[in-house]
From Swiss-Prot:
Keywords of the record: Electron transport, Membrane, Mitochondrion, Mitochondrion inner membrane, NAD, Respiratory chain, Translocase, Transmembrane, Transmembrane helix, Transport, Ubiquinone
Organism name: Varanus flavescens (Yellow monitor)
Protein name according to UniProt: NADH-ubiquinone oxidoreductase chain 1
One GO CC annotation: mitochondrial inner membrane
Record HAMAP family: NDH1_NuoH
Length: 319
């Protein structure tokens, strides 16, 4: 029992530390892009800012408005963080916590479950702003999961299996980014929408919905939603890295880990750069982009990936 608990903690704590410093990186980057310093008081160069923010949020009194549903209100952020942590289990870094045969499929299934916590949070808040924000988030997440699923299917047809290790083996000689760059481009934009990041941050909608589905949250529960959002950003970028720009063969674990961290960091910084550079989309444009542009494109590319091995009599390797 004790080794299992320690093993899980050793997995969760580094993720939370990475999330904390990603928030600092975002504030620093936004600061420098707006010609200011960003956090620079707490600790050397402001490095202790995320720890101070965390302490402040978790020691604040959790205010619960009278009209809310208490059980769902508290369980939603806990469920959100649990699902965000569960997604990490099948990811090889270079060894996965649980080596699943259907690793990619399980990641897709767990990420779909995260929608429930957002919907519950909006409904339990009993506020019109929160429910509109949560409905937007659910519609957006479910819609973009369609393209993510089709892109994953196309990649799986190329690799010939559902395991994450097979992806690194397939990319020993060339990255899948070079052969499937339209899919990689659409995948990256879909991950932005899936994680509700700018320019697709319509769930927050500061000008109209105050803060979206988490408007009634304060203190600890709000911090849990905050951690969930940034953990999802990192895990999506990890997935992008493994799918399209392989970190290398797992036979060299140290090199694999350094490569994986570096590439994930570059992708995460591009998320922050996009937030600082682009204005928000209108909601109809967001849905138009998916249903009228991405969906036909991904489906046609999926058909192409399916027909190519058959037409050239080259059946993918069976694991």
């Amino acid at each position: 029992m004790l080794p299992t608990t320690i093993n899980s903690l050793m997995y969760i704590i580094p993720i939370l530390i990475a999330v904390a410093f990603l928030t600092l990186m975002e504030r620093k980057m936004l600061g420098y892009m707006q010609l200011r310093k960003g956090p620079n008081i707490t600790g050397p160069y402001g490095l202790l800012q995320p720890i101070a923010d965390g302490l402040k949020l978790f020691t604040k009194e959790p205010i619960r408005p009278l009209h809310t549903s208490p059980t769902l209100l508290i369980s939603s952020p806990i469920l959100a963080l649990t699902t965000a942590m569960l997604i990490w289990t099948p990811i090889p870094m270079p060894y996965a916590l649980t080596n699943l045969n259907l690793g990619l499929l399980s990641i897709l299934a767990i990420s779909s479950m995260a929608v429930n916590s957002i919907l519950w949070a909006g409904w339990a808040s009993n506020s019109k702003y929160a429910i509109i924000g949560s409905l937007r988030a659910v519609a957006q997440t479910i819609s973009y999961e369609v393209t993510l699923g089709i892109i994953l299917l196309s990649i799986l047809i190329l690799t010939g299996g559902f395991t994450m290790q097979l992806l690194t083996t397939t990319q020993e000689f060339t990255w899948l980014l070079t052969t499937s760059w339209p899919l990689a481009m659409m995948w990256f934009i879909s991950t932005l929408a899936e994680t509700n990041r700018a320019p697709f941050d319509l769930t927050e909608g500061e000008s109209e919905l105050v803060s979206g589905f988490n408007v009634e949250y304060a203190g600890g529960p709000f911090a849990l939603f905050f951690l969930t959002e940034y953990a999802n950003i990192i895990v999506m970028n990890l997935l992008t890295c493994i799918l399209f720009i392989s970190p290398g063969p797992p036979q060299h674990p140290e090199l694999f880990l350094i490569n994986l961290i570096t590439k994930t960091m570059i992708l995460s910084l591009s998320f922050l750069w996009i937030r600082a550079s682009y204005p928000s989309f209108r909601y109809d444009q967001l849905m138009h982009l998916l249903w009228k542009q991405f969906l036909p494109l991904t489906m046609s590319l999926c058909l192409l990936h399916t027909s190519l091995p058959i037409s050239t009599s080259g059946i993918p390797p069976l694991s």
